[in-house]
């Protein structure tokens, strides 16, 4: 195997398609960005704790407000465009258009994506995915980095703002009028 990205193993230096993702051995996960395949390392316990708590908070908010959006935790397939060379599994995806959902996952950009940074995914989350999500039409992108004690919120609508928070802050969700997540109460 060769290495790609931030030491994330690639199978080989060639162009892949979504069909190649489906031929991976059971239990092996990968993402496909512009035809390059990135094997995904298993998440840490802390990563999973953050993901589980966030999904629970988001799901509860949607249900209590009788919202039309749906929240999904990885592994959940997101096909960002019509081409067959980009396939991602964001840590958390919130999709508000039911027409984008089918049995295979989400076709098109989710409204809100959260990536929880791990040592192997830093370059992907901070650079490559940031650009892919922005240009695919994601409205809001959060990067949760427990190592740096920060949450970066990119709002890709309107003024395209970027806000930086700590893991002790209240963070406003841009796709909802009255939704704020209290990271300080999550006991991460």
Report each predicted region and the residues it spans:
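Gly/Pro/Ser/Thr-rich low-complexity, intrinsically disordered segments predominantly at protein N-termini
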Residues: 1-188
């Amino acid at each position: 195997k060769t290495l790609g990205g931030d030491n994330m193993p690639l199978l080989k230096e060639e162009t892949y398609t979504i069909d190649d993702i489906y031929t991976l051995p059971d239990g092996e996960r990968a993402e496909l960005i512009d035809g390059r395949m990135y094997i995904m390392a298993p998440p840490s316990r802390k990563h999973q704790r953050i993901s589980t708590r966030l999904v629970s908070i988001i799901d509860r908010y949607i249900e209590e407000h009788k919202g039309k959006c749906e929240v999904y935790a990885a592994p959940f397939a997101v096909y960002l465009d019509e081409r067959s060379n980009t396939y991602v599994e964001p840590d958390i995806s919130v999709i508000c258009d039911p027409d984008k959902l089918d049995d295979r996952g989400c076709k098109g950009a989710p409204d809100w994506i959260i990536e929880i940074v791990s040592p192997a995914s830093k370059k992907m989350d901070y650079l490559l995915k940031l650009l892919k999500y922005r240009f695919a039409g994601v409205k809001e992108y959060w990067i949760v980095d427990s190592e740096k004690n920060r949450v970066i919120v990119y709002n890709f609508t309107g003024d395209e703002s970027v806000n930086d928070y700590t893991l002790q802050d209240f963070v406003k969700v841009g796709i909802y009028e009255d939704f704020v997540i209290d990271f300080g109460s999550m006991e991460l």
